[in-house]
Amino acid sequence: MDVTAKYELIGLMAYPIRHSLSPEMQNKALEKAGLPFTYMAFEVDNDTFPAAIEGLKALKMRGTGVSMPNKQLACEYVDELTPAAKLVGAINTIVNDDGYLRGYNTDGTGHIRAIKESGFDIKGKTMVLLGAGGASTAIGAQGAIEGLKEIKLFNRRDEFFDKALAFAQRVNENTDCVVTVTDLADQQAFAEALASADILTNGTKVGMKPLENESLVNDISLLHPGLLVTECVYNPHMTKLLQQAQQAGCKTIDGYGMLLWQGAEQFTLWTGKDFPLEYVKQVMGFGA
């Protein structure tokens, strides 16, 4: 790819960032489509995020992806949020239109799309959702919008717990889905929730390097063959949770599905063009 002065810059702001496949995926897509953009990753945490956004405006960047730990903070630095992003309380995509910043969340639409592409109908179903960070709440919000009957959210009593309660209130007030929030330490409640669940989704970083030997499911017997188990983590590709699920006879969806579909939507938001889906799946080795 020959980058010229006519090219516009798209970024990714996260910390850590070195594990991300997004730059490779997006640049392959941009090159295939023949579009004058280049995508670069920047190590940005909560402390440096405000300055990074000022830099985005000053450099007239087309936009940026936003990942951990900046997804919730980023909402404070855009001029407009989509209705879904307001419901989530976090964004993973910023589009810069001549200094006017719009915030979107494609994590939720991407993950739910991956579930649908597998042939699973979420309408009327119950999801056990692990975590209350930006990705997890995005999945929950989009699932609620698209027809989930109930979401049982489990999170440790950490800095995200109150945010989880606020998220549940927003979803309960604005959709027909019922969301409850429970401390993950309550293993009896967790076991009971899994017994009646249709979907288990890990929206945390547990399972991602260097936590690749960990899973929030301590007892594999809690998983049953009728359960669909889905992951947000894609590094490693086969997390411990997915290994447990396959051993228990569950159908699984790996983190590549969410990465692919959320990235496809981002691509269109930034460029106005269709994402070369089949090409990217092939060159990236995604089975989604």
UniProtKB/Swiss-Prot annotation:
Protein purpose: The actual biological function of YdiB remains unclear, nor is it known whether 3-dehydroshikimate or quinate represents the natural substrate. Catalyzes the reversible NAD-dependent reduction of both 3-dehydroshikimate (DHSA) and 3-dehydroquinate to yield shikimate (SA) and quinate, respectively. It can use both NAD or NADP for catalysis, however it has higher catalytic efficiency with NAD.
Stated EC number for the protein is 1.1.1.282
Protein's UniProt name: Quinate/shikimate dehydrogenase
What does the subunit section of this Swiss-Prot or TrEMBL entry state?
Homodimer.
Question: What is this enzyme's class at the first EC digit?
Answer: oxidoreductase
Q: Which residues participate in NAD(+) binding?
A: 132-135, 155-158, 205, 232-235, 255
NCBIfam families in alphabetical order: PRK12749.1
Q: Which reaction does it catalyse?
A: L-quinate + NAD(+) = 3-dehydroquinate + NADH + H(+); L-quinate + NADP(+) = 3-dehydroquinate + NADPH + H(+); shikimate + NADP(+) = 3-dehydroshikimate + NADPH + H(+); shikimate + NAD(+) = 3-dehydroshikimate + NADH + H(+)
Which controlled-vocabulary keywords does the entry list? Amino-acid biosynthesis, Aromatic amino acid biosynthesis, NAD, NADP, Oxidoreductase
| Organism this protein belongs to | Escherichia coli O7:K1 (strain IAI39 / ExPEC)
Q: Which GO terms describe its biological process?
A: amino acid biosynthetic process; aromatic amino acid family biosynthetic process; chorismate biosynthetic process; shikimate metabolic process
Residues the entry annotates as binding substrate? 71, 107
Recorded hits in SUPFAM superfamilies, A to Z, give: Aminoacid dehydrogenase-like, N-terminal domain, NAD(P)-binding Rossmann-fold domains
What's a single GO MF annotation on this record?
Answer: shikimate 3-dehydrogenase (NAD+) activity
So, what pathway does this thing act in? Metabolic intermediate biosynthesis; chorismate biosynthesis; chorismate from D-erythrose 4-phosphate and phosphoenolpyruvate: step 4/7
